[in-house]
Structure formats: C-alpha cells, structure tokens
C-alpha cells in the first residue's frame, strides 16, 4: 500500500505539470519517488525490496483498472502506444525500470554509496531513457 500511494502521489504531481514528453514523464515520476524516499528513510527501508509491488501487483492492477484509469501502469502503456515506442515487452520494461530504481537507489540514499543520490540520478535517468528508446 505504501509504494502504491507513493506512485499515486507522483502521478498526481505529474498531472500538475506541463510535461508532455513520454520519457520526461517517466523520469519525473521516478524522480518524485526518489525524492520522497530520500525525505523518508524509514519508508525507503520498509518498501526498498518491494517498490514494484505498488505498480505491478496483479490484484491491485485489476482493482485500479476498474476504479482508476490513471495509474502508472496505464500511463506507461498509453505512453508507449501514443509515442510509437517499440518495446519487445512493455510489461518487462516497466518492471525493470521500477526494480532498477528500487534496488540501486537504496544504498545511494542511505549510505551515499557508490554516489550520493543526486550524483547518481543522471546515470540512472540515462539508463531509463535508453530502455525507453526505439
């Protein structure tokens, strides 16, 4: 539930911006999540290994599809269609992005290892953009 709320808050924040580029939208959401986890180390420790659960749990996806069209999964799938992004397996790509964020940011946020999170972000965002390129 905590990671689900984190992504929901990120989407609500995105809706208040004028970001229209698909990759920039995904980076915005990831940046929002990282910044929130940086502000709340206890939350980071609590959900560090299960960040993708809030987006990818099949039960949640089914409920959200009925209740809320605007979740990260739907934004991602809609974005790749609208932008003609050719991904071999969009589900796997989204899962990889979220897992990459969850697994690599933990040490950067808590221990500044291998870099502080602010120094690490450009590397992370470059990899995410590469995953989203045609």
Task: Give each language-model segment a name.
Residues 12-16, 47-56:
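Short linear capping/connector segments at secondary-structure termini
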């Amino acid at each position: 539930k905590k990671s689900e709320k984190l992504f929901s808050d990120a989407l609500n924040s995105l809706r208040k911006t004028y970001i229209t580029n698909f990759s920039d939208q995904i980076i915005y959401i990831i940046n929002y999540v990282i910044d929130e986890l940086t502000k709340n180390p206890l939350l980071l420790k609590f959900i560090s290994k299960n960040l993708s659960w809030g987006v990818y749990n099949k039960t949640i996806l089914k409920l959200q599809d009925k209740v809320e069209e605007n979740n990260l999964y739907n934004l991602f799938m809609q974005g790749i269609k609208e932008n003609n992004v050719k991904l071999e397996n969009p589900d796997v790509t989204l899962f990889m992005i979220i897992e990459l964020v969850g697994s690599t940011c933990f040490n950067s946020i808590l221990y500044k290892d291998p870099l502080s999170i602010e120094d690490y972000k450009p590397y992370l965002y470059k990899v995410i953009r590469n995953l989203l390129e045609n």
